[in-house]
Regions:
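N-terminal cap/lid segment of alpha/beta-hydrolase-fold proteins
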Residues: 2-44
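Short beta-strand element of the alpha/beta-hydrolase
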Residues: 45-54
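Serine-hydrolase catalytic-loop signature spanning alpha/beta hydrolases and amidase-signature enzymes
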Residues: 54-60, 75
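Conserved alpha/beta-hydrolase
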Residues: 65-87
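Alpha/beta-hydrolase active-site loop
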Residues: 90-115
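Alpha/beta-hydrolase fold nucleophile elbow
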Residues: 113-128
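Hydrolase active-site cap/lid region
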Residues: 136-189, 213, 228
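Serine-hydrolase catalytic core
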Residues: 187-274
Length: 281
């Protein structure tokens, strides 16, 4: 564990190898995905954090990735299919598939061995759609050591409201406004995909499969995209009721992107990982 304050202190120049930021390529669904790996200074092997961005990915949390690196974690940020210049088409299902593929690939000997990574210690940290994806991916992969959802979007809490035509239309229109960096989809297609998935995308149902892992949920009280009364508080209650014994949860007085709580977010996430992912640096 690093002893200096990772938010204001660069690593010692005596640490070797030096920190680096290589671009990586992953394959998912026949398409090539671009990733940026933030490798800490020092011999490692370094624990891995895959940082999952939201829809469409305006906030990609590179500041969090840099803070994670200074704290001793190798942080990966990547783009899903059909987003930000990547090939293929965007869909919620493709996001889930891409996250699973990348999470597996980063731990292979080819990548982990080449970049001083510890494949035995991996966490997922996601924002918004990325929070949903982090929890869903961790529930399906028992080897993921810890998971954090920040302003997570709970599809299962929203889809039942689509029986109201006005609500459904509102989501179609809201999604349409965010499609510029995405390809091959529409607001109607995204809402229809949510309806087809139904309760299978309810995050509350994941409690039994997350009960043996540390889980961090961060809500935001000034959030109009994922209001904490809908997306955060009910999920906390569901995970406490099951229970998920190593659940930690917070609500920050901030907007969806935590625009004025970036330092607090970094400290909260890294404190959680330091205690729960057993960093041994």
């Amino acid at each position: 564990m690093m002893t200096a304050d990772f938010l204001v202190s660069d690593p010692s120049s005596a640490l070797t190898p030096a920190a680096s930021t290589p671009a990586l390529r992953f394959t998912s669904g026949g398409e090539t995905l671009q990733g940026i790996l933030h490798i800490p200074a020092g011999p490692g092997p370094h624990p891995i954090v895959v940082v999952l961005h939201g829809f469409p990915g305006n906030e990609r949390n590179f500041d969090l990735a840099q803070a994670l690196r200074r704290a001793g974690y190798a942080a990966l940020v990547f783009h899903y299919r059909g987003s930000w210049g990547m090939g293929g088409t965007w869909s919620w299902g493709h996001v889930l598939e891409d996250a699973a593929q990348v999470t597996a690939a980063i731990r292979t000997d080819e990548i982990a061995g080449a970049h001083r990574l510890d494949p035995r210690r991996l966490a997922l940290v996601g924002h918004s759609l990325g929070g949903f994806t982090a929890l869903m991916t961790a529930a399906d992969d028992l080897t993921i050591g810890a998971v954090a959802s920040v302003s997570g979007f709970n599809f299962g809490a929203v889809t039942p409201t689509f029986t109201d035509p006005a609500v459904r239309r509102g989501y179609v229109e809201a999604f349409e406004e965010e499609l510029l960096p995405l390809r091959g989809t529409s607001g109607e297609a995204l809402v229809a995909e949510m309806e087809a998935a139904g309760d299978a995308w309810s995050l509350a149902r994941l409690a039994p499969r997350l009960a043996d892992r540390p889980v961090l949920l961060v809500g935001t009280s000034r959030d109009t995209a994922t209001p904490h009364e809908i997306h955060h508080e009910p999920l906390v209650r569901a995970y406490e009721a099951h229970p998920v014994p190593r659940l930690e949860h917070h609500v920050f007085p901030s907007d969806h992107a935590l625009s004025d709580h970036r330092v607090a977010l970094a400290r909260t996430v890294i404190d959680f990982l330091d205690r729960r992912l057993a960093v041994a640096e």
